[in-house]
Amino acid sequence: MKRFLHRVKWPLLLSSIAVSLGIVAVACAQPNSRTIENLFRPSSAFTDKNDGSINATLYKALENREGLTQYLTMRLAPVLRNFYEENVDDDIKRNLRTFNTDTDNSFVNQEQNLRNQYRGDYLVRLQTDILDNTGGNQANWKLRDVNNKIVDDFINKLFTKNFVEYVDKSVGVLSTPLKGLIENQSNWNNIKIQAKFVDKNKRLRINNDAVYAAIQDKLLDQFVTNENPNLVSRVVFTNETPNDGFDNYFNPDLIKSPTPSYQFQVFNKYNQQDNSIKGANGFHILASNLQSYVNTNNKTIDIPNKFSSDSGGKLLLKASDMFDTFDPSFSAAFIQGYLALQKKSKGAEQTEYTKLEKDKSIIENFFVENNSAKAAMKSASSSSQTTTVHKTDLAKIFKENETTKSTDVFKGEYQKKFSNATSTSNSDSSNNSAIVDLKELKKDNNSQPDLILARGKDGIHLMGVDGGGYYLSESGRDVNKQKQFLLFRALQTKYGLIDTNTTYDFKLFDEVKKHFDKNRVLFLFNALFKLVDSKESNFLSFPQFKKFSDSIITVKNELKDLVESQYQQIVFNEVATAENKVALKLAERNQPFIDNERNKQIWMNGLAAVLPYEQDSKTGHYNELGIYYKDIIDKVSSNTSNSNSNSNSSSSDPFSKKIIDKLKENKKKVEAAVKKHVDELKVSVIPSPQYSQIILVDTKLSSDPRNTSLALNLALNAVLSSDELQNTIRRDYFVNDDQFKQAIDLDKLTFKNWNSLNNENWNIFKYTYLFDLFQKQANPSIFGNGVNESSTDNKPKINGVLDSLYNSLNLEERLDSNDLINYYSYLYTVQWLLKDNLKNLKQNLQAKLSRTTNSFLVWSLASDKDRNNTASQAMSVSSSKSVLVKMANNVASQTNQDFTKQEQQNPNYVFGSSAYNWTNNKTPTVNSAANDISSLYYTKNNGSSSTSLTLMQKSAQQTNNQQRRFGFHGIVTNTSSNNLPDAVRNRLFTSFVSQSEKSSSNGGQAQLQSTQSSGSNETIYKGALFSFGSLTKLIETIDNIPTQAEFDALYNHLTSNLNINVTGVDRSKSLQEQKTNLKNFANSNFNNTQTVQLKQAQSKTNNSNFNDVFSRFEGYIGTNKTSNYSSYNFLQDNQIYHAVYAKQINLEDVSMLGSDSLNSTDSNNSKRLDLSLEEFLSTVALEALNPNNQTQAINALIANAKNGLVRVGDNRLFSAISSQWVRKF
């Protein structure tokens, strides 16, 4: 305490004005001594670990996005200050003075507010609450505030004016360019971003525009490169209510009150007598003059707005937000047109149309001949590849799903077109129609498609990439030409040089600013550095801006590598995020159609069609649509001073692989640039101000030491409370735990042969964790279905799906992420449960299991008994009902295969629909009627247990084959049921012996003796008291009951849950007498050594089946309990069938756990809960997911850390992380 009081007498680092104010304040009031005692004492390092050093923490700060922004802002501000200080515009100079004045006043007001609120403690609160977070002292607070004002003001000035002009080589900027001049494609290189009336040889106010215009130009370069923006000319014909009513198209018995929508897309027919320019008549005019809207000279596309149901015009589609902003069908169709212009189209029907059907209903353009359910698609790499399913055969789909319907989905012409299932007149005709969602249109057979006709949720769109024919070609995207074209359109709108019938609103630099605002300072630095490197003349050569220019060059020399590497990394990450939205938004688009199938209302999908874009079965990405995004990555990579790549990617790699390789490669560049920069600054720790609780740093080796030191401190402030830095501390515990490292390779995240377990054993833990994560995903179909495209097996491979999910986490690279710490915590819990001969697992299970209630290992699957299986043909099932339903109705296949051992290929349509194949997956999965996707979670047993084999398997003597059983829920107790359905949980714990079982006569389906295999002596009460283990344990339990409430609980469990007719217990007697009576009942009824006469006497009390109440029950539980599947009756709950397999365990089983439990060569399953090794490890894996077990394990990790708790030297970090992980220096 004495030393600390001495330290707080250090002088506060203030300006001369602040010093006088501080003296007056101290004279008026002194802080409370307890307030001072409670202050955190900063040290000279952030933690006592190597990665807690000053430099290591600064590395983290400058790799962190917010930390980098804070740092670069303070480095940018002094550069811009030179622009303000030497400016000839008095208004700009005055702005700088105003910033300083406003900042001074703001500080005074803030200080007074704290004085009023905290009185004597206000100086402490000023330091801890305000100054510690803003550079450490008053001078830095003010410098930071002024710097932020300078940066904000300069950026606002950047976009005040529109500098897009036509620049004649002879006369300069034309004040009023002619329409014909700028529409000439050969003149587009004269359209520039250039300020008017500037003169580099004079000191003029107007010369400031040269600064703004030059920076605008570079920001536009960034925008065009990073966003790949394309203007799309389009009109829409919105969905209509037909004049003759929906009932003439769709069956009103099935489709009640349809509304105009994508599914029920109907348009009124063309009427030659109607002079309207909207709807079908407008479409007729449009289709008759289609190619007149495409200018073959300058490649512009202008479609008259008058035909559109909305205002028409053009839309700017950008990589970052088009799938958020627009209908995903529309955005995907745009990409299709974009790729078609580069001959990279893979999605549209192979036939590219030169004309439209204009004399009928608009929708009929999407009815195509259906000689085959498959139509060829063009490949991006080879026009000879034709493998993609595209046409949607509605007749086939409805036929497969609606054999029980006596009426057609369609009526009138639609019925004729699609030859619906129950239409016998032409259902087998070769000329019935299928439906598509998109058509490519071209002028003639010798040209590329330049227009797209596409269906969307709001109507039908005719669209084309405006100018795409100019800057897109087979060799790719020409970014410079794309920029020229956008400037051409921007110049048109600026000067109103647009035909009145094709007007549109296009504010190019509003879009540029929107892109710029995402990363303002980093992008501005990048633009300034590009200007330094530019060969074109710009403001940097103006004598008027010499000081400003020199400061840009100086800071470029210091920050170039840092800015360039971080710029690339941020752009790569944003493009990756944008591309991920493709699968996500298309999944959202498809979900209602899948739901209709799942909910037995497939007819509600109406005219919905599969989008013509293939989903990669393995990754879930749409690789062809990803070409659009891959182009951005390539352009950004090539647009740097050091574009040499060590990436393993090839040009043919899909985006999903290329982006991962690029991010990994560039991450190393970021780390190297950050380390080099920080090390060169030779940062040191400086004394903390009075009352401060933080570490402050300083550098003398920068071109601007004061602002650089402030920048470093603000970067630290941003990162010290971040998850990333906290996770660095947490990770330190894991990587320094010797036992954990013996089990896990923490660098590669692979498993070692620890505790007799091999890699295959360890994978059970990995995939259990991933499956739990998979179940929590809102759109799991975005991870594909795990099917290898070269495989002939069309079943989903769940491990392949989980691998895709694991790859998306990118844990090997994200070492400070929450995802990694969560995975570490789980794996450590596994290791903690298994170490020391399973001591911790044993203790936890002893606490989890109870003597007084049964516990089970449970496998459970569920199915809607009325749910149709839309892929029944693929499953070779004649009926449309699900396999589970067929079994429940005792019409299972002749092999009598156990349902819980059948892999559910697509439970609850989790991978979409194979009938429609909405994701257009190359290897669609077969639908399953199972509701519960836990059917994908399987365990293996070695087949040695006779009760787990079917009769067929027994007769074939297949006792050594490893069997799979699906729907594993692990250890289930009455208080921990692991998401079991209510019906299953109630059957196990509140009606293990049901009244129907008890009252059923011999020969009834529920009485077990009549349904067992020959020689079976099982009873309906088998296992009822298995939790007690023996009669002796039951008597001990009764003896040890201390209260009436506990006795009542046991009594009610026996009589209500187990349906045992307990006799001889007078509930009005004392607790001791009731206990004695219950023990007498137990001894006389549950003792296997009693005489035959006693057993015969017991039959009169309906308790004749008590001889095996302490035996383990293992088998199927439904309306009956049986160990043989052939006699099993499913558990029913309203519309749901449940297939349940259960195995009892008790505390005696737990007591057997020990050193031999993990021995794969030991066939004695009694040492591992009577389970195979694989089943046992799956059980442990689920226990490791338990939050309570993880908490215990992490507490043990921290408590046993060989170096004790991590010591922290800065209050910001100490306050951010839980105190269980750290202590003060």
Swiss-Prot record:
UniProt GO cellular component terms: plasma membrane
Signal sequence annotation: 1-27
Species per Swiss-Prot/TrEMBL record: Mycoplasma genitalium (strain ATCC 33530 / DSM 19775 / NCTC 10195 / G37)
InterPro entries given in the database record: DUF3713
Pfam families reported for this sequence: DUF3713 (PF12506)
Top-level taxon of origin: Bacteria
Name by which UniProt lists this protein: Uncharacterized lipoprotein MG309
Subcellular location: Cell membrane
Keyword annotations of the record: Cell membrane, Lipoprotein, Membrane, Palmitate, Signal
Residues with a covalently attached lipid (S-diacylglycerol cysteine): 28
Region (Disordered) residue spans: 995-1014
Membrane-topology annotation of the record: Lipid-anchor
Lipidated positions per record (N-palmitoyl cysteine): 28
Assigned protein family: Belongs to the MG307/MG309/MG338 family.
Knocked-out gene: effects: Probably essential, it was not disrupted in a global transposon mutagenesis study.
